[in-house]
Amino acid sequence: MNKKDKKKAPQKVAKVLHPLSRKAKKLTLEGIRDIKKEKNANIRKKEQKPIKQLLDHFQEIVKKENKKIFTESEVSDIIDQFLKTKTPEEEIKQVTSRTNKLEFTKSQHNDEIKEFKNNGYSVPDLTNANYVRFLLNWDGDMKYITQQSLPLKKFKYIEQPKNEMETDSK
């Protein structure tokens, strides 16, 4: 007898579930639960995107500067630099084009600048060595960022005296 002649065992046919059975209900609820989890994860990512951009920018600066502690004026300069790099035109290119999207992003950008100059802008506290070290070692995953691990502190705009500004330009 050849191997070809041997009969293969019939494959098991998947059991058909009755639509009103408990198992069918359980499977549909699991499917709905998975969809909700995915939807909530997408919403969470969308809400955390501006914070992640801010933290990425600060992490890049901290790695470049290689300091353990920053002064308040240095943090103010970093915030000012971040707000200047974050222009509405760049954001509009990333998002699908709408007619009023450019005006909205420009007004939002202007509001952020006003908030920074008047009330203060919430950023990671780089005046503490522990938080600077945490930001240096951070791998970019937002699930590790909590209020205890990296608290946000408000910093106001600090204007540099004219003497310092002249020496910077030379």
Swiss-Prot record:
Query: What Gene3D superfamilies would the database entry show?
Result: Translation machinery-associated protein 16-like
GO CC list: nucleus
> Would you identify the family this protein belongs to, as annotated?
Belongs to the TMA16 family.
Instruction: Please state what the protein is called.
Output: Translation machinery-associated protein 16 homolog
What's the source species for this entry? Dictyostelium discoideum
